[in-house]
Amino acid sequence: MRLVAVLCLAASAAVCARAQVDAELTAKRRLFPEIGPGLKTVKRGVDGKIYVLASPTPGLVVFSSEGKRLLAIREMGGLTAEARKEAADSGEVLVGFGEDFDVDSEGNLYVADRAGNAVQIFSGTGKHLRTIPVNAPLSVATLPEGEVAVTTLGGPELVSVYDKNGREVREFGDPDTLSDRQDLNRFLNIGELASDALGHLYYAFEYFPEPTVRQYDRFGYAGQDIVYRELDALGEAQAVRREIAKQESRKDAPRFKRVLTALGVERGTGEVWMAMGDTLLHFDKEGNRRATYLLYTPEGARVMADTLVVEKDKLIVGGDPIGIYEFERPSDK
């Protein structure tokens, strides 16, 4: 093992977490080399297709399992004024700015359109099906029976759930208290969603001092918290807490660097993987850390993860602007 610097808070560069690394993972290959800047999310559908969101361009792109481009759902910000007019005249529904998306078992696409203050729903062929008005959506995850879970920039609860008709049916998840300043505390509770095939929902707190993923059932009952509290992460957590205290007395908008940068859940087992920049942590379904890895491209550059797909035999990791890479899944031995 070797000690490697993994993540520094921009505002507190003097303090840096150091993690014990079990192995270095080098990507087998780069996927979709035309995609890099603006990359938001990568998903694998049950149909084997790979879905990629990069905003504002090229938008949400669907690839076959062999890598052939099948479909693109465009965004306003990636088009000229003339192209936007042509789209409007033709009846094409454009996404304003996609922050995240998910795909359900039927291939329908749910896009968190932050600029449009909505979740836009498209069929697998790109036909627009429905708009759900949601103020500043940040992350989405599909649930059984056509439901979709949504996180927002400032809702009173962490998660809102909408049914197949676009009606809000429940909210859940009280924000944890990290600051007495209300807007700052809500910002620090911003999170990313994922779901598994077992009916669980996962909420990754992106700005918590200690990287944390909370498990819920689909009805909002909280299960376990998976928290990275190893000694090597103590310095980073202390730096984040100092920055919280520093910004608490200010009146301007919160400004923090994400601590937990990507969440991946193996759909069949519910095992959680979380990324902190170029460092990848694997936890078993009981929340025990199994291993820690560093991520590299075939050329030796670090892969700073913004999105993560976990499969039985491989990992797909993507970052803005470095692009999307396929890794052989390690055995954790």
Model-assigned labels for residue ranges:
Residues 19-333:
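Eukaryotic scaffold repeat domains enriched in small/polar residues
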Residues 4-12:
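Bacterial N-terminal signal peptides
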